[in-house]
């Protein structure tokens, strides 16, 4: 059965109180571009310009025309530190995709090669911008990272009480939190890890 676009507007939020008791129940999601993967450097490599210097239609056309663009991106300078700090919590990857369908498999291939753990790709970028299963199946096995590709605006469909998203796009925070989740606005690894520890999601050092 397809998982349709969510419509919940629940504000039941998992706050700081009691988080330590629920630590094992927290579900971690981590974005790729701008968090683990250096998307900006990739764009600059193939265009000679920074992403914000390009009109969106030119940027995405270049991404679509560059063979294996997402698969060949490098890590953010502090991306491996972040991943190594959270991978013990059995996180899933939650990453937005452009309209070119081949980009979905490219992102999954990057994760399979780079994350150092078994992965399972689940494509949720459905027709008419729906959040529904297009291909793949979520693994429930411990230690397997589900790589969930979806439309960015639908990331909140994965949110619920205890769901933690690390993402660099602040515009996604409101909808994620409205469904009960915890949003970590990523600007760098040091700050994100500090916030996770402050909330009791990661142990203090």
Where are these regions (language model features)?
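Short, acidic loop-to-helix structural element flanking the phosphoryl-transfer center
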Residues: 55, 63-93, 100-105, 109
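Short catalytic/ligand-binding loop motif for oxyanion handling, primarily in non-cytosolic enzymes
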Residues: 37-39, 45, 91, 100-104, ...
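Active-site neighborhood of HAD-like aspartate-dependent phosphohydrolases
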Residues: 14, 18-67, 178
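Structural beta-sheet core signal
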Residues: 93-95, 165
């Amino acid at each position: 059965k397809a998982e349709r676009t969510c419509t919940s507007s629940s504000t039941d939020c998992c706050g700081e109180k009691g988080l330590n008791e629920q630590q094992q129940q927290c579900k971690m999601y981590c974005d790729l571009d701008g968090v683990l993967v250096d998307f900006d450097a990739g764009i600059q490599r193939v265009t000679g310009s920074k992403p914000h210097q390009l009109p969106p239609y030119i940027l995405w056309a270049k991404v679509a025309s560059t063979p294996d663009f997402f698969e060949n991106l490098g890590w953010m300078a502090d991306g491996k530190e972040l991943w190594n700090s959270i991978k013990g919590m059995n996180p899933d990857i939650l990453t937005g995709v452009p309209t070119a369908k081949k980009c979905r498999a490219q992102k999954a291939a990057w994760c399979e090669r780079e994350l150092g753990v078994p992965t399972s790709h689940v494509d949720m970028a459905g027709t008419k911008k729906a959040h529904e299963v297009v291909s793949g199946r979520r693994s429930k096995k411990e230690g397997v990272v589900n790589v969930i590709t979806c439309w960015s605006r639908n990331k909140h469909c994965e949110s619920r009480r205890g769901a933690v998203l690390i993402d660099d796009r602040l515009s996604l925070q409101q909808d994620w939190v409205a469904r009960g989740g915890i949003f970590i606005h990523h600007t760098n690894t040091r700050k994100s890890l500090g916030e996770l520890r402050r909330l009791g999601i990661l142990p203090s050092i």
